[in-house]
Amino acid sequence: VGACSQAQRKTSCRSIFCCLLHWRRRRETCKFHGNRCVTSVSVALKDQRLRLLLTTYHQAFLSPGGGETELHQLAEYINDVGVRADLYGPNSRRLSAYDAVIHFSAHGGGEGLLQDIKAAGKPIVLIPNFNFFDQQHKANDVVQRHLDLADLVILRTNVEKDLCQKNFVIANDKIAVVPPGIAPGFGKPAEEGLFQSAYGLDRYILWVGQIAEHKRQLETIEALQGINIPLVFVGGYADKRYYDQCRAAAGDYVRFLPYMQPASEILRSAMQSCSVYLELGDDAPGFSSLEAALAGSPMVLNDHPWSREMFGSLQIYVEANNPTAIRAAVTTALDTRTRNQLTEEMRSRHLQPGPTRHLLELLKLKVGR
């Protein structure tokens, strides 16, 4: 190689170092000896990618639901597009190793963590996962503290942005709207008839999500009694007392199935094959409604501003506290059998990794990358 100092060789000829990052094979020319020192080496290039820490309030995973699933999926999507993301916990690194923090939820208990992150000088992106449509919410002070600590607030719809600015103190340039994303697996067709074969069904009405009082599954069960098409619930429950009430009110036509892995073939099959997809809670529908729209399912939804912005006028909307209207809407959807009205729009606007790339572009502006 020629005579050069140990320091020179360390930065040139022998630029091979141990690392857990991705390895790449390349030809490297010694900066001290030119072409006389060309060698083929495995070099672990210095990782210049963003590194993000994802956090939430500490009680979140005591009773995990859709929000916790979304947090896990967000970490996966971020890593898939080339940015390193870790969930906060025993296996995450020191805070100083991260360029920014994405905090999920404005639930009480997260403020102390965010205060420490802010004091360390790390940019905070907040995804509130808060029901801005509830004008009687008692946690407004807690939410305001989260908003104050954030450098960037990501909301899902323009109607949520308007409500946030109406009811809280926040600068317009601190808020951005990023459409909710659908797991890319939902874009794949499932084996035809898989769900029906597994559960002995033909036509059926589907509702995916946690059983909870504010979701109004009990009222739906009562409204659809005698409709003669099975009503299938997929998901766990938050309140066993309410779940037991639903089971007691359910006749033979109602099926309660356990939680299914997001984007799994059995869940995709359930959505792609159902006669009607139903979701009638007091709050905005969950991500499952977007997944059902991508699958082409006819849908009956609670008449909610979030739904109107997401789906326009192509779905059937109904007041969730009106049993007669619920039954009439479901009957209409069953008779119409119109499918695939929103499939292409959902694919282009909501299918991941598009929304995650949008989020990261906004975040990079905040951290100067």
Spans of features found by a protein language model:
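Conserved acidic donor-binding segment of nucleotide-sugar-dependent glycosyltransferases
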Residues: 6, 315-323, 331-337
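A charged, aromatic-enriched C-terminal amphipathic alpha-helix characteristic of glycosyltransferases
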Residues: 1-21, 66, 334-368
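Acidic anion/phosphate-binding donor-loop and adjacent secondary structure
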Residues: 137, 165-166, 181-197, 203
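Acidic donor-binding loop of glycosyltransferase active sites
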Residues: 269-284, 297
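Helix-loop-beta element that forms the nucleotide-linked donor phosphate-binding surface
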Residues: 161-182
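Short glycine-rich donor-binding/catalytic loop of glycosyltransferases
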Residues: 282, 297, 301-311, 320-321
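Nucleotide-activated donor-binding/catalytic signature segment of Leloir-type glycosyltransferases, i.e.
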Residues: 235, 243-262
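Conserved donor-binding/catalytic core segment of Leloir-type glycosyltransferases
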Residues: 1, 196-215, 221-232
